[in-house]
Amino acid sequence: SAASDVYKRQVLIDMSSIDPTESKAISAALAEKGIDMLDAPVSGGEPKAIDGTISVMVGGKRETFDKYYELLMNMAGSAVYVGPIGSGNVAKLANQIIVAVNIAAVSEALTLATKAGTDPELVYQAIRGGLAGSTVLDAKAPMMMDRNFKPGFRIELHMKDLNNALNAGHAVNAALPLTAELMEIMQSLKADGCEKEDHSSIVKYYEKISNVFVERERK
């Protein structure tokens, strides 16, 4: 049905986040009908999607990317060509690994600060200007300390991406031990009923095993 819908357009730009092997299979099926495909997953979360500054990671033929670059830039802050079909989703999986590990690191650090009797807000302010500063730190540390787990990106969706990353890693004999550990952490959160919360709720796992509660000090 996808092929019939795009037949006259001659190209399918798939912006979903899926296993790279699925992108390749879809592309092969479309190619039999003379239709090109780009796999073009995005990153940046809901806020950047709303304001049109998401990052797009694109796989497919270079000439097809060049042809539709301006179209992609109408909705994005950046659109980067990564390589042949499936490469966009490889980049997205790499992105999701980095985001998950960073959120876990922020959670672990703020748990340490709180358990040591130090105001996590002041620790956050102290480190955000140094090498540990990052987009993830600035986006997720305040959410953790404010106990705001309204989903920008849900745990269950991040689990889907990490599962795809593990499958992709196994397919090419790449060991992904941190990804596997994060999957187990998220599985624990799912068992606690947190799967529909924002992935910043990873901090709850650390709170549970350390018997501590991360939040801003009340003035």
Regions from the language model: what does each represent?
Residues I13:
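Catalytic-core elements of nucleic-acid end-processing and repair enzymes
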Residues D51-G59, V80, P84-A116, Q125-A139, ...:
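Active-site-proximal catalytic alpha-helix in oxidoreductases
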Residues I85, N89, G133-T135, A139-H199:
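Interdomain hinge/lid region at the active-site interface
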Residues S1-Y7:
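Short, small-residue-biased leader/transition segments that mark boundaries at the very start
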Residues Q187, A191-K219:
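NAD(P)-dependent dehydrogenase/reductase Rossmann-like domain
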Residues S17-Q96, A100:
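Rossmann-fold dinucleotide-binding core
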Residues D119-R128, A180-E184:
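Beta-strand segments within the central parallel beta-sheet cores of soluble alpha/beta enzyme folds
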